Amino acid sequence: MAAGRDGVIHLLRQLQRASCRCPAHSHTYSQAPATARTTDYAFEMAVSSIRYGENVTQEIGMDLQNWGTRNVCVMTDRNLSELSPVKAVLNSLVKNGINFKLYDSVRVEPTDKSFMDAIEFAKKGQFDAFVAVGGGSVIDTCKAANLYSSSPDSDFLDYVNPPIGKGKAVTVPLKPLIAVPTTSGTGSETTGIAIFDYEELKAKTGIASRAIKPTLGLIDPAHTLSMPERVVANSGFDVLCHSLESYTALPYNMRSPCPTNPINRPAYQGSNPISDVWAKHALRIVAKFLKRAVRNPDDREARFAMHLASSFAGVGFGNAGVHLCHGMSYPIAGHVKTYRAKDYKVDHPLVPHGLSVVLTSPAVFSFTGLMCPERHLEAAEILGADLRTAKIKDAGLILADTLRKFLYDLNVDDGLAAVGYTAEDIPALVKGTLPQERVTKLSPRAHSEEELAALFEASMKLY
């Protein structure tokens, strides 16, 4: 009996010493024993349920009925409130006998004030479910309304990311939330992230918690057919950068600190083997279909593919995270002066989120290419680069040049100068980036304030 036990113990020890060949434990993702760690040793995937199909929006009333819902808050913005996506949702609710109230005052690029207005509406309504119909602004606003109406005694900054907020863990149960995205970019229907402008500091921040992710995302590609050209382009740039940044992010087991409790493990954990798969797949779709989707509104194959790619990238970055392009984008959007983007019906100056992200991408990936050059080269090749004579030391420059050509072909504004910024704005842009440590710390290459300033300077002109 003892001999048998000794044999089992010997076998277990041999297995522990064996070299594991799976992606999670080879090269980038190799792990040390989990004793006294300063960096994390685990990652987890938190994703909303997703249902995809043309005209699948018609099922939303049945879902709410199946859940026993009695009083629903439907959130959208004024531009969408009279259009077919919202009409399809409301028709389904009426058909299935669901009581609802419509909130159509969501602000495109929401602020803390617009969040609080929506939260107050939700608190007064005593809703038992939420529906968000729109782009990332609508879905993020609805997430916040669900959270704070479910935790009515919380201060607004309790759940906001540090250093602006307290970053408390969400421990209260939330109501079901169905997201119906009408753009192909943010991936917000799959993530536990809600982004807004904190007006006092003129900086973007947000709430990041798996608890606020939608219960269900209804991915209905029919809603993409009426998207204007620049909305398609700018939302597609968000998919592009979600994919690139999550794939090149600091690996999850190099991120610190190691949480003492799994509830404290951040939503943005660093690149990992599962997120990598979704990021690369989304990037391939962008490479194949984004230009077609922008140039031809009747190209159903391209527009439908990009709508799904947004969710694919959301699965990836919603767990791996993003880094410098997004971190630097927040002050670009927050400090906007007079720029008004084409095809956006808003009453205020606006640098659309996807545009604010992609304008720094050539400079950023030139900078990060030294740290994971193989991944930068792989991304460049997916986007069309010829690597036959490529040198690994040039990985960042190759990806940057590939991105410049891609953006030029899609008539993207020629850098930050084209959207109203000058060299004198760089200190404010750097200052606005510093609070974004939640994402910037996932850059594969550490950076100083001087290096951030150099990246903004390099992004003033693209071509």
Swiss-Prot record:
Alphabetical UniProt keywords: Lipid metabolism, Mitochondrion, Oxidoreductase, Transit peptide
Cellular compartment(s): Mitochondrion
Enzyme Commission number(s): 1.1.99.24
One Gene Ontology term, aspect cellular component: mitochondrion
Keyword Hydrolase (UniProt): no
A molecular-function term among this protein's GO annotations: alcohol dehydrogenase (NAD+) activity
Keyword Disulfide bond in record: no
One biological process term in Gene Ontology: glutamate catabolic process via 2-hydroxyglutarate
Role of this protein: Catalyzes the cofactor-independent reversible oxidation of gamma-hydroxybutyrate (GHB) to succinic semialdehyde (SSA) coupled to reduction of 2-ketoglutarate (2-KG) to D-2-hydroxyglutarate (D-2-HG). L-3-hydroxybutyrate (L-3-OHB) is also a substrate for HOT when using 2-KG as hydrogen acceptor, resulting in the formation of D-2-HG.
Record PANTHER family: ALCOHOL DEHYDROGENASE, HYDROXYACID-OXOACID TRANSHYDROGENASE, MITOCHONDRIAL
The protein's name: Hydroxyacid-oxoacid transhydrogenase, mitochondrial
Gene name in the database record: adhfe1
